[in-house]
Amino acid sequence: MHLYTYLYLLVPLVTFHLILGTGTLDDGGALTERRSADATALKAEPVLLQKSAARSTDDNGKDRLTQMKRILKQRGNKARGEEELQENQELIREKSNGKR
């Protein structure tokens, strides 16, 4: 029973000691120093992008976002322009007339 009392007191003390990082590793380095060095080595470097480099461009080197804004403005912020709608309606009429 006396042994269990010592273990009961020793286990939380050792655990607390390791959590705080005051324990040492086999090579003599402190636990927290080793972990912080590893974390620093693995930390990703921030990537700074210029505004133009962050946007995708088409084959001609033009900015796709700017082109889409321009196209939507011309269409009146509709998904399809008037010409495309008329062409689609004509195709639907032709197909429906062909089935009869």
Swiss-Prot record:
Give a GO cellular-component term. Answer: extracellular region
The annotation note on the cofactor reads:
Divalent cations stabilize the toxin the in alpha-helix conformation.
Which species is this UniProt entry from? Conus geographus
Task: Spell out the family assignment given in the record's similarity comment.
Answer: Belongs to the conotoxin B superfamily.
Gamma-carboxylation recognition sequence that plays a role in the conversion of Glu to carboxy-Glu (Gla) as annotated region, ranges: 61-80
Please share what else the UniProt entry notes about this protein.
Answer: The mutant Gln-89 consists of the addition of a proline residue which is hydroxylated (4-hydroxyproline). The mature peptide does not contain cysteine residue.
Sorted alphabetically, which InterPro entries does this protein's record hold? Answer: Conantokin_CS (IPR005918)
Q: Name the residue ranges with Basic and acidic residues bias.
A: 56-66, 90-100
Protein name in UniProt: Conantokin-G
Q: Which residues form a coiled coil?
A: none
**Compartments, record wording:** Secreted
Lineage, top ranks: Eukaryota, Metazoa, Spiralia, Lophotrochozoa, Mollusca
User: What's in the keyword line of the UniProt record?
Assistant: Amidation, Calcium, Cleavage on pair of basic residues, Gamma-carboxyglutamic acid, Ion channel impairing toxin, Ionotropic glutamate receptor inhibitor, Magnesium, Metal-binding, Neurotoxin, Pharmaceutical, Postsynaptic neurotoxin, Secreted, Signal, Toxin
